[in-house]
Amino acid sequence: MNMSQNLDFIHSAQRTIGLERDAVDSLLARIGDDFVKACELLLAGKGRVVVVGMGKSGHVGKKIAATLASTGTPSFFVHPAEASHGDMGMITKDDVVLALSNSGSTAEIVTLLPLIKRLGITLISMTGNPESPLAKAAEVNLDASVGQEACPLNLAPTSSTTVTLVLGDALAIALLEARGFTAEDFAFSHPGGALGRRLLLKVEDVMHVGEGLPQVLLGTSLTGALMEMTRKGLGMTVVLDEHGKLAGIFTDGDLRRALDRGIDVRQVTIDQVMTVHGKTVRAEILAAEALKIMEDNKIGALVVVDADDRPVGALNMHDLLRAGVM
């Protein structure tokens, strides 16, 4: 591959991006009352937003439906050809149909228009032709027209699909803001994602409890405490007083500091080398908050206590890493 070919590829990419940027700039200038009306209709809908589209518009429609659904507007995609063969039963009079068609004359969508009207379903269109059958049948049409496709043959849907996608994103975010949709709301629709884990996962979901919680009593020999730490594998142990309440915590770091001071591990009890009380958290706080406490205090483990200061669990950095909080 020679330098000339490289330059041709770069020029092609720049031309495509430039044309699509211009199409989006033109869309930006057209946003007005029709967009406001579309948002109002979508907010007023008592059911779901049903997105329909054929071909490339269908692919874009699936993404728009997914974005709406994940940002507080219940939505799903229906293939218009399948709608003509039974899937129309998925749509109710309380729903709002968002129909995508660059030409506005897609046969499979036009076929559905009489039924949509008969059922009294709200119809919003997104087309590149405001004089098309679809645009005229809709309560509001969002102009998704473009001056030119990025394809040099002006055939492959490129600029038009970009504009449609951007317009769909604009609708989704406008509705998100109107609904007061929060990061916590977003997390509930993305429980498997990183944000969902940070905003939903609690300490109680990852902490070690019961037999998995390393614990010794005040007066236990240091060697005994080390054996408990080794058995439980958390790099720490909780130290309890005679009432079962937290007296302290002993960690790998405490052991290193004790050895640096020349302490004979065979001659001391845990009381002499533990960190008194130590940092604690409650089980109901977010795991992300526990992580911040660890980072702020440069510690690798936390004891989880109840309202009576009794240890009920423990967790360390590795637990948070495995849970995907870090």
From Swiss-Prot:
Outcome when changing residue 56 to A: 100-fold reduction in catalytic activity compared to the wild-type
InterPro entries, per the entry: CBS_dom, CBS_dom_sf, GutQ/KpsF_isomerases, KdsD/KpsF-type, SIS_dom, SIS_dom_sf, SIS_Kpsf
Pathway: Carbohydrate biosynthesis; 3-deoxy-D-manno-octulosonate biosynthesis; 3-deoxy-D-manno-octulosonate from D-ribulose 5-phosphate: step 1/3; Bacterial outer membrane biogenesis; lipopolysaccharide biosynthesis
Family: Belongs to the SIS family. GutQ/KpsF subfamily.
Site (Catalytically relevant) location in chain: 56, 108, 149, 190
Broad enzyme group: isomerase
Domain CBS: 207-265, 274-326
CDD domains, per the entry: CBS_pair_SIS_assoc, SIS_Kpsf
Lineage: Bacteria, Pseudomonadati, Pseudomonadota, Gammaproteobacteria, Pseudomonadales
Function: Involved in the biosynthesis of 3-deoxy-D-manno-octulosonate (KDO), a unique 8-carbon sugar component of lipopolysaccharides (LPSs). Catalyzes the reversible aldol-ketol isomerization between D-ribulose 5-phosphate (Ru5P) and D-arabinose 5-phosphate (A5P).
Domain SIS: start-end pairs: 38-181
Listed GO biological process terms: lipopolysaccharide biosynthetic process
Temperature dependence: Specific activity decreases significantly at 5 degrees Celsius compared to specific activity at 37 degrees Celsius.
Annotated source species: Pseudomonas aeruginosa (strain ATCC 15692 / DSM 22644 / CIP 104116 / JCM 14847 / LMG 12228 / 1C / PRS 101 / PAO1)
Subunit relationships: Homotetramer.
Knockout mutant characteristics: Cells are not viable.
Binding site for Zn(2+): 79
Domain of life: Bacteria
Keywords assigned: Carbohydrate metabolism, CBS domain, Isomerase, Lipopolysaccharide biosynthesis, Metal-binding, Repeat, Zinc
UniProt entry tagged with the keyword Membrane: no
EC number per UniProt: 5.3.1.13
Residues the entry annotates as binding substrate: 72-73, 79, 85, 111-120, 145-147
Name of the protein described by the UniProt record: Arabinose 5-phosphate isomerase KdsD
Annotated catalysed reactions: D-arabinose 5-phosphate = D-ribulose 5-phosphate
GO molecular function terms listed in the Swiss-Prot or TrEMBL record: arabinose-5-phosphate isomerase activity; carbohydrate derivative binding; metal ion binding
